[in-house]
UniProtKB/Swiss-Prot annotation:
Localisation per UniProt entry: Nucleus
Region (Disordered) location: 27-61, 819-840, 1025-1046
EC number: 3.6.4.-
UniProt gene name: Smarca1
A Gene Ontology term for the protein's cellular component: nucleoplasm
Keyword vocabulary terms for this entry: Activator, Chromatin regulator, Coiled coil, DNA-binding, Hydrolase, Isopeptide bond, Nucleus, Phosphoprotein, Repeat, Transcription, Transcription regulation, Ubl conjugation
Domain Helicase C-terminal: 494-645
Record's compositionally biased regions (Low complexity): 39-50
UniProt name for this protein: SWI/SNF-related matrix-associated actin-dependent regulator of chromatin subfamily A member 1
All copies of domain Helicase ATP-binding, residue ranges: 199-364
C-alpha cells in the first residue's frame, strides 16, 4: 500500500530543509506566491495538513478504494456499477477541484464549464461581463466557491457555508531552493519558480503549457516535476515523455544527469527491437518514465493505450495544434491523469489551433470549438481591448512564459549581424534566366497563380544560395572540388573569408541552411579546405545524430563546423559548445531561425554568441528577411501581452510575393558583371553591422499600427488616401512594367561586314572544285585498292586543266596563297590517263565492296559496338541484307585497313566504348556468380560488407533481395530493372514496405550499382587474401625428416 500523501510530504519536509510545505486554503497558488518558513514550521504545518487531510485521502486514494471494495463485497454484488462508481469518485473530485480553481482565477471560465446543452455559442460583444445565467437545477454543479462578488439568497449562503465547513485544506509543497533529489547541480531561481508553478497546477488538477523561451531549461523543470511526484507524492509513474526523434538522446542524458533516481527507458528501434523491448522491459514495469518519439507512438499506439499514464508530457507541442492530425488523435486516446505541453515559441496560432491545445489539456472545460471561436472572435479580439483582457485572463492559468532577457542575467549576450553580399557572374546569369522565363508574371496585373509565384520565389532563393543547386550549372563531368565552388557564389566567398577568421579566433561554428543539397556543397567545401565537420539533416538516422552531437560537444573536440538543416536541426539540440551561428539562408518563419540560434545561445554557454545572417543584396532575399523582421517585431508587441496574432497577417499574399520577385529585377537586368569585391572580412562585417543597426532602429521606431500597415512596395503607399487605393484604379489602364535586358550585340567596325549585316547578304561560299561528269563515286569504307584513288585523282586534275579551272584562295586554311599555288601547279601539269591506266582503273573498280552502302557500314559499326569485334555471328544478324560470309569477309578487311578511313579515331572510340561496357558486364556477372556461390541459401544467408557506405534508406533484407533477384533474372537482360521492380511489388515480405514498393526502375538500378561495387570490392579483398596465403605457403621450405636405420 502507498503511504499517505500528506504524511509523505511532511516527512520529506522535515528531512529536507530545502522544501517548504504550505497549507493553502482559499488562496490562489502560483509561481509568484512564496512562504518564507523554516523546515520546522514546514514540518508542523505538514503534520497539521496530514491530520486535516486524512478524511480526504481515505475517500480518494485508489488503494483504499480497493480495500473498501473488498470489505463491502455484499454491497458490490447488489450494485453491478459499484466498482465503476468507486473508481470514478476521485476523478469527479479532481474535476470539481479543477473547476473551483479555474473559477477563482477568473469568472470567464463559468462560461465554458456550464453544460453545453444549456447554452449555444454567443458572441461576447452581446453579453455583459458577468456569470452566465443557468437554471436553478444546475446551480449546484456550477456555483464557484471562490466567487464572493455576487449577492446570494440566504438559503444559498447557508448551503455555501455548510459546503465550506466540509472542505479540507490543500497541501502544496513549494521550493525556495533547489530540491535535494536534483543531483546535477542547483536550479536557477526562475527554474525553481517554474517548478513551483508546475506543482501548483498538479495540486489543483489543472494541465498547462510551459512556454519558456528556448534555452531556459524546460526539460530540466519537467524532470524536476516528475522527481517531485516520486519523492514527495510517492507517485513514481508511469509517466510518458513524447519528444522529437532528434532530442531522444538529449532527454535521456538530462534524466541521468539531473534526477538519476528516476528509472527511465527509451522506446525506439525497428519492429523486432520494439517487440523484444515491449516484452522484456515495458510489460514487467520496472521503470518510472518512458521517453519515446512521435513516430513510435503512432506505430505502437496499442501498446501505449494499455497504460494509465500519471503524466503525459509532449515536447514541441505545436505538433498537436491540428486536432485532426494522426498524432493528435492518438494522444487523445491515451489515458492520463495529468498532461503538460512544452513549447519554445509563443502562442502565435489562430484561435482554432489554440482551442485544439486547450482542448487536449482540459477537454471537460474546452469541449466546444464553436463556442470558443465565438467567445473570442479573432477580428473583434484584436480590436477590442476588453476582449484582449479576457483572452489574457483565460490563458493565464495554463500558460507560463519567460524570456531570457528577463530571467537569465548570467547568460552571455547574443549579437546578430546581417551580412549583405552581391551576386557572382554565374548567379546573375541564372537569376536573369529565371526572371526572363516568367517575365509575363512580373509584368502582369491580372489573376496570378499562387503556386507559380511560390515556385519562382523558391528558384530565386536557390540562385541566391548557390547556382550549383541547378542541374547543369556546375562545370563537368569530370566534376572537381576547387576554387570554383567558392568563386561562383557570393555567399560562399564571404563564408570562406569568415570561416578563416573564426578559425583563427578559436571559435566553433554552426551553419544552418534550409536546403540539404546545399549542405552537400558545403561538405565538399569543408573537405577541400580541410575543416573537420559534422552534419545533421532530416535523413540522418537517430544513432548517427547522437554520435555527431556527442562528437561535437566532446571536450577538446577537433570538429570545427556543425552543419544542420534548419528544420531538422533547430529543435531540442544542445550545441552550446559552439559560439558562432551562421544562417546561410533565412526561413519564412522567423521563429524557426530563432530556434536555430538557440542551439548555441542557451544555458551552459560561456562565450558571447555571434550570429551572422547571409543576405544577397538587391534580390528577393532582402525582402524575405525584411518581412521576417517585421513579423518578429509585431509578434513581440502582441504576443507578450497575451494576445493572438491575426491569422491573416501570417499569410503571404500573392501581391506581396509578386513585389518580392520584382524587387531588384531591374538592377539585375541592368548589370551583367559580378558584384563581388576583394574586400577583407573586417570591412564586410563593419558594413553589415552598420546596416543591421539601421534596420533595428527603424523597427524599434515603428509601432503596431505602422507594422500592420507596412508593405514591401513602399511606393504603393503613396497611392492610398482616405482608405481608398488609387493605385488599383490606375492599374486598370496601365501595368507596372519591368523592362527585360536588351539583346547584346558585339561591336563590329568592319564596313563590309556592317553592310552585309544591314542588307542581310551572306558572304559567298567558295564553290566546290569540278569533277568529271561520269566518274564513279567511290567511298573509303568500300576499301578499293589504293591504286584506284591515285588514278581517279589523276583523271580529276586533267579534267580541271581542260576546262581552264583556276583554284580560288581559301582564307580558312593556313598559308592560303602557298596552298593555292601548289594546287594550281598540279592542275597545270596534269596528263590524261593512258589506255593501260584506263584498263587498270576499270579492273580496280571491281575489287572493292561495291555493294556496301553507307547504311550497311553504319549498321556494321553499331553491331561492333554492341557485341564486340569478335562476335561475328551477332554482328552479321545486325547488318540487314548481308550474309554471315559477306560480313565476315568485310570484317577481316575492315580491321586490316581501318586506318585508311577518314573518321577512324571517332569510329574506334565508339567501338571501344561498347567493348568496355561488354567487359564490364562480364566482370559484374563474374562478381555476382562468385558472391552467390558462397551461400547455400543466398536469399536468407547473403551478407553485404557495407563498410562506411551503408545507405540511409534501404535495409539489408531489401539489398539481399535485389542482388539475388538480379542474379537470378540475369544482369545483362533488357529491361531487367523494370522486371525487378515488378518482383519487388509482388514479393510477400514487402507487402507493407511502402518505401521499397514506391521505388522506380531507375532508383533500383542506382542502388544495384552501389551494391555491385561493394561486392566487387569484397571479392578483390578475398582474392588478395587468397593470393597472399598461396604465396606464403609457396615460400615455406618443406621440412625433411631423416630417420636412422640400425
Amino acid at each position: 500500500m502507498e503511504p499517505d500523501t500528506a504524511t509523505e510530504a511532511a516527512t520529506v519536509a522535515v528531512s529536507d530543509a530545502r522544501a517548504t510545505v504550505v497549507v493553502v486554503e482559499d488562496e490562489q497558488p502560483g509561481p509568484s506566491t512564496f512562504k518564507e518558513e523554516g523546515a520546522a514550521a514546514a514540518a508542523t504545518e505538514g503534520t497539521t495538513a496530514t491530520e486535516k487531510g486524512e478524511k480526504k485521502e481515505k475517500i480518494t486514494s485508489p488503494f483504499q478504494l480497493k480495500l473498501a471494495a473488498k470489505a463491502s463485497k455484499s454491497e458490490k454484488e447488489m450494485d453491478p456499477e459499484y466498482e465503476e462508481k468507486m473508481v470514478n469518485m476521485p476523478l469527479k473530485a479532481d474535476r470539481a477541484k479543477r473547476f473551483e480553481f479555474l473559477l477563482k482565477q477568473t469568472e470567464l471560465f463559468a462560461h465554458f464549464i456550464q453544460p453545453s446543452a444549456q447554452k449555444s455559442p454567443t458572441s461576447p460583444l452581446n453579453m455583459k461581463l458577468a456569470r452566465p445565467r443557468v437554471k436553478k437545477d444546475d446551480k449546484q454543479s456550477l456555483i464557484s466557491v471562490g466567487d464572493y462578488r455576487h449577492r446570494r439568497t440566504e438559503q444559498e449562503e447557508d448551503e455555501e457555508l455548510l459546503s465550506e465547513s466540509r472542505k479540507t485544506s490543500n497541501v502544496c509543497v513549494r521550493f525556495e531552493v533547489s530540491p535535494s533529489y536534483v543531483k546535477g547541480g542547483p536550479l536557477r531561481d526562475y527554474q525553481i519558480r517554474g517548478l513551483n508553478w508546475l506543482i501548483s497546477l498538479y495540486e489543483n488538477g489543472v494541465n498547462g503549457i510551459l512556454a519558456d523561451e528556448m534555452g531556459l531549461g524546460k526539460t530540466l523543470q519537467t524532470i524536476a516535476l516528475l522527481g517531485y511526484l516520486k519523492h514527495y507524492r510517492n507517485i513514481p509513474g508511469p509517466h510518458m515523455v513524447l519528444v522529437p526523434k532528434s532530442t531522444l538522446h538529449n532527454w535521456m542524458n538530462e534524466f541521468k544527469r539531473w534526477v538519476p533516481s528516476l528509472r527511465v527507458i527509451c522506446f525506439v528501434g525497428d519492429k523486432d527491437v520494439r517487440a523484444a523491448f515491449i516484452r522484456d522491459e515495458m510489460m514487467p514495469g520496472e521503470w518510472d518514465v518512458c521517453v519515446t518519439s512521435y513516430e513510435m507512438v503512432i506505430k505502437e499506439k496499442s501498446v501505449f493505450k494499455k497504460f494509465h499514464w500519471r503524466y503525459l508530457v509532449i515536447d514541441e507541442a505545436h505538433r498537436i495544434k491540428n486536432e485532426k492530425s494522426k498524432l493528435s488523435e492518438i494522444v487523445r486516446e491515451f489515458k492520463s491523469t495529468n498532461r503538460l505541453l512544452l513549447t519554445g515559441t509563443p502562442l502565435q496560432n489562430n484561435l482554432h489551433e489554440l482551442w485544439a491545445l486547450l482542448n487536449f489539456l482540459l477537454p471537460d472545460v474546452f469541449n466546444s470549438a464553436d463556442d470558443f471561436d465565438s467567445w473570442f472572435d479573432t477580428k473583434n479580439c484584436l480590436g477590442d481591448q476588453k476582449l484582449v483582457e479576457r483572452l489574457h485572463a483565460v490563458l493565464k492559468p495554463f500558460l507560463l512564459r519567460r524570456i531570457k532577457t528577463d530571467v537569465e542575467k548570467s547568460l552571455p549576450p547574443k549579437k546578430e549581424i546581417k551580412i549583405y553580399l552581391g551576386l557572382s557572374k554565374m548567379q546573375r546569369e541564372w537569376y536573369t534566366k529565371i526572371l526572363m522565363k516568367d517575365i509575363d508574371v512580373l509584368n502582369s496585373s491580372g489573376k496570378m497563380d499562387k503556386m507559380r509565384l511560390l515556385n519562382i520565389l523558391m528558384q530565386l532563393r536557390k540562385c541566391c544560395n548557390h547556382p550549383y543547386l541547378f542541374d547543369g550549372a556546375e562545370p563537368g563531368p569530370p566534376y572537381t572540388t576547387d576554387e570554383h565552388i567558392v568563386g561562383n557564389s557570393g555567399k560562399m566567398v564571404a563564408l570562406d573569408k569568415l570561416l578563416a577568421r573564426i578559425k583563427e579566433q578559436g571559435s566553433r561554428v554552426l551553419i544552418f541552411s534550409q536546403m540539404t543539397r546545399l549542405l552537400d556543397i558545403l561538405e565538399d567545401y569543408c573537405m577541400w579546405r580541410g575543416y573537420e565537420y559534422s552534419r545533421l539533416d532530416g535523413q540522418t538516422p537517430h544513432e548517427e545524430r547522437e554520435e555527431a552531437i556527442d562528437a561535437f560537444n566532446a571536450p577538446n573536440s577537433s570538429k570545427f563546423i556543425f552543419m544542420l538543416s534548419t528544420r531538422a536541426g533547430g529543435l531540442g539540440i544542445n550545441l552550446a559548445s559552439a559560439d558562432v551561428v551562421i544562417l546561410y539562408d533565412s526561413d519564412w518563419n522567423p521563429q524557426v531561425d530563432l530556434q536555430a540560434m538557440d542551439r548555441a545561445h542557451r544555458i551552459g554557454q560561456k562565450k558571447p554568441v555571434r550570429v551572422f545572417r547571409l543576405i544577397t543584396d538587391n534580390t528577393v532575399e532582402e525582402r524575405i528577411v525584411e518581412r521576417a523582421e517585421i513579423k518578429l517585431r509585431l509578434d513581440s508587441i502582441v504576443i507578450q501581452q497575451g494576445r493572438l496574432i491575426d491569422q491573416q497577417s501570417n499569410k503571404l499574399a500573392k501581391e506581396e510575393m509578386l513585389q518580392m520577385i520584382r524587387h531588384g529585377a531591374t538592377h539585375v537586368f541592368a548589370c551583367k558583371e559580378s558584384e563581388l569585391t576583394d574586400e577583407d572580412i573586417v570591412t564586410i562585417l563593419e558594413r553589415g553591422e552598420k546596416k543591421t543597426a539601421e534596420m533595428n532602429e527603424r523597427m524599434q521606431k515603428m509601432g503596431e499600427s505602422s507594422l500592420r500597415n507596412f508593405r514591401m512596395d513602399l511606393e504603393q503607399s503613396l497611392y492610398k488616401f482616405e482608405g481608398e487605393d488609387y493605385r488599383e484604379k490606375q492599374k486598370l489602364g496601365t501595368v507596372e512594367w519591368i523592362e527585360p535586358p536588351k539583346r547584346e550585340r558585339k561591336a563590329n567596325y568592319a564596313v563590309d561586314a556592317y553592310f552585309r549585316e544591314a542588307l542581310r547578304v551572306s558572304e559567298p561560299k567558295i564553290p566546290k572544285a569540278p569533277r568529271p561528269p561520269k566518274q564513279p563515286n567511290v567511298q573509303d569504307f568500300q576499301f578499293f585498292p589504293p591504286r584506284l584513288f591515285e588514278l581517279l585523282e589523276k583523271e580529276i586534275l586533267y579534267y580541271r586543266k581542260t576546262i581552264g579551272y583556276k583554284v580560288p584562295r581559301n582564307p580558312e586554311i593556313p598559308n592560303p596563297a602557298i596552298a593555292q599555288r601548289e594546287e594550281q601547279k598540279k592542275i597545270d601539269g596534269a596528263e590524261p590517263l593512258t589506255p593501260q591506266e584506263t584498263e587498270e582503273k576499270d579492273k580496280l573498280l571491281t575489287q572493292g565492296f561495291t555493294n556496301w552502302t553507307k547504311r550497311d557500314f553504319n549498321q556494321f559499326i553499331k553491331a561492333n559496338e554492341k557485341y564486340g569485334r569478335d562476335d561475328i555471328d551477332n554482328i552479321a544478324r545486325e547488318v540487314e541484307g548481308k550474309s554471315p560470309e559477306e560480313v565476315m569477309e568485310y570484317s577481316a578487311v575492315f580491321w586490316e585497313r581501318c586506318n585508311e578511313l577518314q573518321d577512324i579515331e571517332k569510329i574506334m572510340a565508339q567501338i571501344e566504348r561498347g567493348e568496355a561496357r561488354i567487359q564490364r558486364r562480364i566482370s559484374i556477372k563474374k562478381a555476382l556468380d562468385a558472391k552467390i556461390a558462397r551461400y547455400k541459401a543466398p536469399f536468407h544467408q547473403l551478407r553485404i560488407q557495407y563498410g562506411t557506405s551503408k545507405g540511409k534508406n534501404y535495409t539489408e533484407e531489401e539489398d539481399r533481395f535485389l542482388i539475388c533477384m538480379l542474379h537470378k533474372m540475369g544482369f545483362d537482360r533488357e529491361n531487367v530493372y523494370e522486371e525487378l521492380r515488378q518482383c519487388v511489388r509482388n514479393a510477400p515480405q514487402f507487402r507493407f514496405d511502402w518505401f521499397i514498393k514506391s521505388r522506380t526502375a531507375m532508383e533500383f538500378q542506382r542502388r544495384c550499382n552501389t551494391l555491385i561495387s561493394l561486392i566487387e570490392k569484397e571479392n578483390m579483398e578475398i582474392e588478395e587474401r587468397e593470393r597472399a596465403e598461396k604465396k606464403k605457403r609457396a615460400t615455406k621450405t618443406p621440412m625433411v625428416k631423416f630417420s636412422a636405420f640400425s
